[in-house]
A protein has these predicted regions:
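A short, N-terminal "cap"/entry segment at the start of jelly-roll beta-barrel domains
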Residues: 1-43
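Short, conserved beta-strand element in jelly-roll/cupin
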Residues: 51, 60-75
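Ligand-binding loop in jelly-roll beta-barrel domains
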Residues: 89, 95-114
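Short acidic-glycine-tyrosine-enriched beta hairpin
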Residues: 79-95
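Conserved short histidine dyad/triad with adjacent acidic residue
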Residues: 39-60, 94-95
Length: 114
């Protein structure tokens, strides 16, 4: 009998990969992103993500669940509702959510896209 393999990440440590710059910056400060992909298939993605200070236009193309472990940022939706993020925050962004993200202190999160 074959059992599914559990995914375990003891530490992000040296596994972090540079994923480049945010593609839709607002202003001169361009956020840099990096992370670690835990699992990816055609219908989901799970991983660790971190982002430096800056602001950008944000469009979530699939449902995304996030648990923020460090930093501070604000998500402002197109209808002007605001989500303030701090360590320990959990957020869910539905497919096609649009708005702006402003990172004021480098953020780190674990996420699941589905």
């Amino acid at each position: 009998m074959n059992f599914p393999k559990a995914i375990h990440l003891k530490s992000t440590g040296n596994n972090i990969i540079d994923w480049g710059n945010i593609e839709t910056p607002i202003g001169d400060q361009i956020s840099k992103v990096s992370g670690y992909l835990l699992d990816k298939s055609s219908n989901h993605e799970m991983g660790y993500w971190q982002c430096s200070e800056g602001e950008w236009d944000c469009h979530v193309t699939k449902n995304e669940f996030c648990h923020f472990v460090e930093g501070e940022c604000t998500y402002t939706s197109e209808d002007s509702s605001v989500i303030n993020i701090s360590p320990g925050s959990i957020a869910f962004f539905p497919k096609d959510w649009k708005g702006k993200c402003k990172v004021v202190k480098k953020i780190k999160k674990f996420y699941c896209i589905f």
